[in-house]
Amino acid sequence: MEHMKSAVKIFRVLLEQGEISKREQAFLYSAYLETEVQEALNLFEEEFECRLLNFSDTVYLVPGMNSHMLSMQPGEFRSYFGSNATNKDVYLSFYILMYILFEFYSGKNKDPKKTDFIQVSHLINRLDERFERLAKLEKEELDKAEEEHGINLATCIEIWMNLLVDHETKRKTKIRMIEAVVDILEDQKLAYMVENQIRTTKKLDILMRQYYLNADRVKLISEAFERGEL
């Protein structure tokens, strides 16, 4: 019974904070290492479609690739883009988020992380290039890419190409769209912005290197970006 109580407490803290570190929560971290507690936590992993990963003396709660219980839902994403935001804004934010991860973690060397930061101006230029190229595709080609990768490219192209880079009075611009995406990442303790530079956290570096880059869907998306299909 005590092992189950410990498991419940650990899972509650992970739901609230996303991680438990040996340095800051030594008692909980020590309890997590007990075999009986981990067996109890396995039940939570199955029920909530998530994974508990222990790297560098820190336990992370990670939603499963197909989880609808712990991962963010479209409505939560929309809240970052203002009261008039629609699902179209969500589709574009997904694309930008995936491309940011590609820019950071598509290295071919032993360490897949290829840069410490991304300038917002650089990101805008790269997205401009990609959407301009995608806009020139025949409808059949675009439809095929959308079906293959599960991404609403036509909507992403339409919204991005009609945005100004920045504007004093407009709430929706390319810069503000990117800032909102970074806000999402920052709230998940994955990335942050400093002087128009996007930087990743230790948490994101660990999860990408040790977990997400090995996932089939992430590999397929990364390869599609590499080939210019997205």
What does each of the following model-derived ranges do?
Residues 45-55, 182-197:
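A short, conserved structural fragment
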Residues 88-126, 143:
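Positively charged, polyanion-binding regions of nucleic-acid-associated proteins
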Residues 21-28, 113-127, 135-140, 147-166:
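Short acidic, hydrophobic short linear motifs in intrinsically disordered regions
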Residues 1-106:
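Eukaryotic partner-binding/assembly regions in large regulatory complexes
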Residues 163-166, 187, 205-230:
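Short, amphipathic alpha-helical interaction segments positioned at domain boundaries
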Residues 120-130, 208-213:
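Eukaryote-specific, cytoplasm-facing alpha-helical/coiled-coil scaffolding segments in long proteins
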Residues 59-62, 197-203:
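Minor-groove-contacting beta-hairpin "wing" of winged helix-turn-helix DNA-binding domains
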